[in-house]
Amino acid sequence: MVLYANRESLIKRYTLKVLEQIAWLPEAQSLDEAKVQEALEDASQTIDSYLGGRYVLPLKTVPAVLERHCCYIARYFLEKNRATDQARQDYEDTIRFLEKVASGAISLGLSDDDETVESENGAMMESAGSVWGRNTSKGFI
């Protein structure tokens, strides 16, 4: 199984202090690494349950957006029954996002076989040439 985020991702997003508040192991006076790992695994499995119907798992290329959503889910799982309003809102938004990915309404930018999708509708700009220049200024410049 591929984890879409890791402990460092959670710390970068929320700070070590916040992570310690929700995953502190009093007996050891340290962060409960097993609890954090379990939350990240559960969050990644939750994401996989939505992606599995649309993409071949495990993904060869993991879009950065999944790391963020994995952190949202993991924090919600770590907070359990005392989830903050923000953690609950992030979790609910993430589930809605994943439902849209599963239905095809939102794309991760990957094809069904997990290759990065090359866009055929890119913008191309062309110039008609210089309108004003030394040669056309007739000595004005």
From Swiss-Prot:
Protein name listed in UniProt: Mu-like prophage FluMu protein gp36
Matches recorded under InterPro entries: Phage_Mu_GpJ
Family under the similarity heading: To phage Mu protein gp36.
Any Pfam family the entry gives: Phage_Mu_Gp36
